[in-house]
Structure formats: structure tokens, C-alpha cells
């Protein structure tokens, strides 16, 4: 049986629809059905479901809030929660697929130079630090794991940059978007398919990096221009100093 955590998030939802299309059986849980910060609750669900495969999509992703008011919740979900899931997965003999982030790196490589799986992590934010701790806990407690680092995730469900731009375009004729932060967007469908590909084909356990194919990095400005290309909204590039953020972007 397959178990999906964070099943109501944008990735968890995409994964559910993908498995539905394939007529695969699974159990989908979110915080109401299994609060991952509660070890007893996690163990109870695992004992009932008896999963052979766990897609751990649950995560705290409010990167700026994690620097202050959300710091405790960030740690509880990304560290304690991941530890609980990893321990339960190992106890019940399940393969664990854990979704991580580019925030585990410092983000100081030259533009266009990719981060490799064996590059040294050096998170610069609370969110990045808790996700890195989650990676270490998965590696510590699970003997059968896939850790997938991804970036700039967007899709048809949940909050993401695409929806934000589309919503702003309904009420603005001009939008300013930062043009000095570089990365590669990742579609939730691509990520969900890659997760299932690794697990179903029993690929080598370990770390993987995934984003959508691109000949070169893009910026949030470039991404916004592409999103709104069929509208009358003017998109203007600005320096990130115009939008101060609590958390440093990699």
C-alpha cells in the first residue's frame, strides 16, 4: 500500500491525481488524519495502513515566516515530523520518498552553474536548515530512501508563483517582479512522475535533483513574463532590494 503525507498540498494533490489515473491504490493523509509532529499518531496510522511505500510531501514552506513567528512550527513539521515519518517507515519496512529543496545550499554559485547532489549543503535560512536536518534524519533512520531536491515548484493546486501572478493580473495593469534571482521552475506533475518513477523502478537509493528542463536559468521576472504573455499586463523588472525579505533566497 502507498501512503501519501501532506496529501492536500499542491504536490500531494498532484500525486493523488496521478495515482488515480493509473488506478493505483493509496491512502492519503493530511494533518487531520495524521499529524506528523505526533509520533503516536504517526505510528497508529502506519500500523493500520501497513505501507510499503511512503511519499512524504508534508512540509512547512513559509520561508520568511520560518525566520521568526513560524520558527517553531517550521521545526516541528520539517524536523520532528520528518523524523517521526522516517522512523515509522523503517519500522514497517517501507521505502521513503522525501521532498527537499534548493534552500539546503548557500546559493552562491555563478549564474548558470548547477548544484550537484554531492555539493556541500550550506543552508542560509531557517527553512533551509530544517529541510537539511530532515534530509539527515531520513538518511539516519531509513535504509530505503529517495531524497529529491527541487526548486520553484508550481502546479494547478495550492499556492504558488503562477497563481499569485494570475491573481495580481486581475487587479493590476503593471507588475514589478525581481530580475536578479535565478532558478529553474518545477511543475508538480513532473515532480510527481519522477517520484513514482524512482520508487516503481526501484532506482538506486539516495539523493536526486530535479527541475524542469531548460537551456539556462530563468528569473522570477522571466517566469512572470511567460505566465502573463497572453494578457495586457505590463511586467517590469526590478532589483530584489525593492522587495526586502526575511529569508535569503538561494
Name each model-derived stretch:
Residues 136-183, 188-197:
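NAD(P)-dependent short-chain dehydrogenase/reductase
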Residues 194-195, 201-246:
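Mid/C-terminal beta-alpha module of Rossmann-like enzyme folds, strongest
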Residues 76, 80-84, 91, 104-148, ...:
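Catalytic helix-loop patch of NAD(P)-dependent Rossmann-fold dehydrogenases
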Residues 5, 29, 54-58, 96-102, ...:
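SDR active-site strand-loop-helix element
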Residues 20-44:
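Adenosine-cofactor binding site in Rossmann-like domains, unifying the SAM/SAH pocket
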Residues 1-21:
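N-terminal Rossmann NAD(P)H-binding glycine-rich loop of SDR-like oxidoreductase domains
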